[in-house]
């Protein structure tokens, strides 16, 4: 019973699917997918209760959300372990994700009040009141890299605003989604307010194309996001929020503390086995002796990165990639770059058949004439040597994406020069570019999104403004308009 529809756990009526721990291929979840008919039932259930959920009022909705927060706190260790088993990420990292899910509640409440609450002002024309209303029924499509935190960042703001939700998680992380819904159920969520439909592409298509949804919030690949954008092109009445990937640049310029620089590079490129949308994919290093020394130190540190299973002791820095297919895809991507003229500094290797375990890779692509503008979603960092700062910035901007970018530089002038010219939604200075604050917006430009920043700005796409001019009674104005006699 792995579909949660109208407050009931029901079996899927589609085909059999399984979820495996990518570090050892152990099956940890199995069920049948939701059919198009079950998706329709889920949407209808969400539609049926949406007005009642809205009319519960913000304080009533907040009470349920706060009860969910309590459940997350009580089950934090369980949530972290399920995320670790299903994604392959080390336990230290998934404990952080479970903590972020808890922290999202308070941040979402603050964002609701700051960005989409109510206000009123007296004007000569009457009392001007600003309110916000929910869109209605929204679909949430979750990713596998942060299967708890990222969909949570759509669902919580959507519910606070008064929407009801149909949640379609990644087919690679169904067990995490199931646990999330069990915690919502324990929190006392009314039937139909969140509905869970588990499945693969056909389930997602049935939900995305359903006529009765009012919006879709998606986190995932640029390819799928662009398909959704084309699908919604003729439906201006539906809100579409796309959070996609990036081919993210990191420039190194004039850094004295090379050990600190190496640390920030590793945290930018290899955390989560390179499976964060903000991970650095391209590293720009000055030509010359200082750049050579930095690269040598970086290569040595990359070789010594510990890789292991989610529960290995001592804990590794990198866990498994999401699947063996993903791991082999990274090996193939490295091979393609080598064939184009790249030079391996540290070889990425598939460590064990039947798993997603890979070692991190570092490749010099300076001699590649036409560097593919691809998001290699794994622990493979491309190095480009440069002689001119403007040239480095120009190359950094040579991408259709625009999610994150960063510079490690001792000079603030260099940072401000870079900041003014780089095209990205997240720009960091002397910090890893995988570091982002939940108290700030999160989103990119170009192929990285559609100008619907999430995180603190998620409240913006969860509600629409309603402007009113009000008076307590109908009254004649002091003077009538010309040509009127009443």
From Swiss-Prot:
Catalytic activities: N-succinyl-L-glutamate 5-semialdehyde + NAD(+) + H2O = N-succinyl-L-glutamate + NADH + 2 H(+)
Any one Gene Ontology molecular-function term assigned to this protein's record: succinylglutamate-semialdehyde dehydrogenase activity
Annotated metabolic or biological route of this protein: Amino-acid degradation; L-arginine degradation via AST pathway; L-glutamate and succinate from L-arginine: step 4/5
Biological process annotations from GO: arginine catabolic process to glutamate; arginine catabolic process to succinate
Binding positions for NAD(+) per the UniProt entry: 220-225
Entry-linked SUPFAM superfamilies: ALDH-like
Catalytic residues identified in the record: 243, 277
Keywords, in A-Z order: Arginine metabolism, NAD, Oxidoreductase
Entry coiled-coil feature ranges: none
PROSITE patterns with a match to the protein in the record: ALDEHYDE_DEHYDR_CYS, ALDEHYDE_DEHYDR_GLU
Enzyme Commission (EC) number: 1.2.1.71
Free-text function comment from the UniProt entry: Catalyzes the NAD-dependent reduction of succinylglutamate semialdehyde into succinylglutamate.
Stored NCBIfam families: arg_catab_astD, PRK09457.1
Family assignment from sequence similarity: Belongs to the aldehyde dehydrogenase family. AstD subfamily.
PANTHER family tied to this protein: ALDEHYDE DEHYDROGENASE-RELATED
Name by which UniProt lists this protein: N-succinylglutamate 5-semialdehyde dehydrogenase
Organism for this UniProt entry: Shewanella woodyi (strain ATCC 51908 / MS32)
